[in-house]
Curated annotation (Swiss-Prot):
Oligomer status and interactors: May interact with Ccs1.
Example of a GO MF term: heme binding
Biological role stated in the UniProt entry: Required during biogenesis of c-type cytochromes (cytochrome c6 and cytochrome f) at the step of heme attachment.
Protein name (record): Cytochrome c biogenesis protein CcsA
Name of the gene this protein is made from: ccsA
Amino acid sequence: MIFSTVEHILTHISFSIVSIIITMRLISFFLVDGIVQLYDSSEKGMIVTFLCLTGLLVTRWTYSGHFPLSNLYESLIFLSWSFSLIHIVPYFKKNKKYLSTITGSSVVFTQGFTTSGLLTEIDQSSILVPALQSEWLIMHVTMMILGYASLLCGSLLSIALLVITFRKNKKILYRNNLLLNESFFFVEIEYMNERSNLLQNTSFFSAKNYYRSQLIQQLDYWSSRGISLGFIFLTIGILSGAVWANEAWGSYWNWDPKETWAFITWIIFAIYLHTRTTRNPKCANSAIVASIGFLIIWICYFGVNLLGIGLHSYGSFTLLAN
């Protein structure tokens, strides 16, 4: 009884903190530079959230007698913990606000869904099914969830890169079209005046473009690092799962829906890494592949559970009925 109470308290404390954090981040976003202390407070709040989630996992492990990764609810808690772990690392390195924004938002939405009440029955700890009563549980599922977390963060950074690149190209195209229209519809003197004004603002646009280019490079750098790390975790998770499957079911691979989509996920990010090995890699091309991978991960991790079929059906769930 006491363990359930502690778990309930830790769950709602972590959710309350991340809800406050997202509000603080919105305030910081709209007020821009004036709220440095507010940003630092949100970072400290994420550390408290990490500690609460750690305590939640330890508590659930203690009273259930097994590592808390036996169903979707527990894996979502662990996914939130993984996001918060990734989040606090750049906090100590400083000057990585865009990365911590991605990871912080991921914690908010994951933890929000976990504690929303949409998941029924599986939020209660139960005895492991025979197939899960193995030492491979910790190795396989931990590596897979850490891989998902790293890949999702890297993919979100790639999506942010695409948005910034698209807006940059759109502004350049608009400016070129504006000058072209002026050359047709205005007299030569007015056109030269516009050109003169444009040259006067060159330093402003150059500085702005420089910082935008630096941001794109940083997003590309951290995206590739996150995806590379996640790909390693995913590979280890798939290989350990194959060994576990051979022990449990007598076959290394059964083309189960979960296994199939995990393999598709691995292929997508293998393609991403391949695009990074070319002599002159283009950020946008690899970012497009990573964006596709973002959708594939959610299909693999979450969408397949909606089916409730296959050898991994014990991870399925039901939504709260009206």
